[in-house]
Amino acid sequence: MVFQGFAEEKSWHGICVFIKNKTGCGTQMTVPVCWRSRTHGDKSKEWEAIMMKYAVLSGNERFEIREGELKSNGCAVLQVTHVGVCGTDTSYWHEGERYRGVVIGHEYSGVVVAPGTNRALKPGDRVAGYTQNVFQEPCGHCEACLAGDWDHCTNRRVFTWKGGELGHPGAYSQYTTWFPHSLVKLPDNVTNEEGAMAEPFAVGLHAIQVSQVKPNDRVLILGGGIIGMSCAEWARTFGASEITVSELNPQKREIIRGYQVADHVVAADAPDLEQQLLDISGAAMTC
């Protein structure tokens, strides 16, 4: 699922999305954007501020479209093209009153406007980002940061919290800023829509690596959401010979069958689930 553009209304009471079969709302809006350049020959600060529109949580199951100034603060500046709807995002949306003022969105792709200090990037490059940084800013000088382990920074701070300065907003915005070291250039054979799914597919890859799936392994995946489907895709890539997905939601089960990522799809709440799994695996149980 991906957002693409903003609705005309001033607030959202629901989430409009694009998915592969083109359902959902499909209106894209082009909004004039005003850059203000304050450069003095320093290319890392070529763009310092921009007026843009962004979606902010304004209550339970409610977004509000606002306009504000985004400062580059020396970071890379990106134009967001696609952003995924993560389960974390929907949790924030349902509890929007608690998270009022937060700009979410961390599964995204975009186009570089200003690369900041990343010399490997240039304006116009298509990128995806290391998404943990949308929720927290690493300090860059603690022991964890110096080891490259930014997730465990001991001095991290949260962005756009409780209506504070826009700072580094999530990707439910026209533009966002990102730490230059957290951006990955998309290869030519990966579309921006596919690039927005880099984060959930990285989660699936990690799960399969940790599970040490090998060629000809038979794999059972508990849960068939985007992460479960990602695990199934990676299990196949790693050579699994048979993949079974167990899922509670009947709609998700049909989606999994439609994408043909698993050999067997079973209802997680089936009274005979244990026997089904034994039959699929060809195993037997003795007491």
Predicted regions and their residues:
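Short, Lys/Arg-enriched N-terminal segments with co-localized hydrophobic residues
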Residues: 34-51
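NAD(P)H dinucleotide-binding glycine-rich loop of Rossmann-like/cofactor-binding domains
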Residues: 134-222
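Glycine-rich beta-strand-centered segment in the early N-terminal region that forms part
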Residues: 71-83, 96-146, 187-189
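Polybasic, lysine-rich low-complexity intrinsically disordered segments
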Residues: 10-11, 15, 21-23, 39
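Mid-domain Rossmann-like dinucleotide-binding core that forms the NAD(H)/NADP(H) cofactor-binding site
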Residues: 188-273
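Short amphipathic alpha-helix with an adjacent loop that forms part of the alpha/beta core around
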Residues: 272-284
